[in-house]
Amino acid sequence: SAACFGAERLYVVGHVPERSRIKASSGSLIDYVDIVPFATPRDFVDFAKSEGIQIIAGELVEEARPLSHYDFNFNSHVCLVVGNETSGVPPEIIHQSQVIYIEMPGVGYCLNTAQAANLLLYECVKQYNKSQSIDALSDYL
């Protein structure tokens, strides 16, 4: 999905599956996205901060703001962070992030990682389209 929304990189903290396993589920789309691995959440945060990348985490925590009321700032690169279904976004990343959540009026309280990422990507692209040219989107995602 990252490639479909114009993202150029996928930052992964922890284990990165073999490329052949990723390709089996994503097809040729994986060829359009660089996968950048990080051993620890701290390594990722340090990298993002050194590069001036905004970290925006999707997580159900008290300080999170609803996605529908969040205004993305496209003055610097944006990194959308989602955690796995079991443990969520690591605290080391949450404490260094702007935190948002996806409002869900139904009976469930969480989505799987891919669904959550797609919703965050969609809202980010939607806001970007309203603010600038779609051709330049990959410069910021």
Enumerate the language-model features and the residues they cover.
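Post-transcriptional modification and biogenesis factors for structured RNAs
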Residues: 1-141
